[in-house]
């Protein structure tokens, strides 16, 4: 079995979840297949219930952090069943010095939209959801 040569650290440890290092500088567009809940181990080592998104194009999933969840809700609404079939553009960003997967936007929105992300004990941040993968 021929394997591809890894070019990013994230590729050394493949797993169930999409990792930002696998994007190789691109912004992939993926179609949401399903949104579910799962018990995942958090950074603190404790099990937490988190949203997990499955996609049509890959068996890899995206664990849903609050920032990405707020962006998806702004684009697609509160009813999760209505997210199925929607396309989402992902990109690699930095968070606490580490690569992180973020939502760039969706070709299913009609124009760029501003989203304010308010997290507990943090200053609100402004994000823009884009219609295309290009900046």
Language-model segments: what does each one mean?
Residues 1-135:
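Short beta-rich binding modules
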């Amino acid at each position: 079995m021929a394997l591809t040569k890894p070019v990013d650290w994230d590729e050394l440890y493949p797993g169930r979840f999409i990792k930002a290092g696998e994007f190789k500088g691109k912004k992939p567009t993926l179609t949401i297949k399903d949104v579910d809940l799962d018990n995942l181990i958090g950074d603190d080592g404790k099990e937490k219930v988190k949203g997990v998104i499955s996609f049509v194009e890959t068996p890899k999933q995206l664990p849903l952090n609050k920032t990405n969840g707020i962006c998806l809700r702004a684009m697609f609404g509160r009813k999760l069943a209505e997210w199925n079939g929607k396309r989402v553009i992902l990109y690699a960003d930095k968070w606490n010095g580490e690569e992180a997967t973020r939502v760039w936007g969706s070709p299913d929105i009609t124009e760029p939209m501003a989203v304010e992300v308010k997290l507990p004990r943090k200053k609100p941040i402004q994000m823009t959801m884009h219609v295309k993968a290009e900046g």
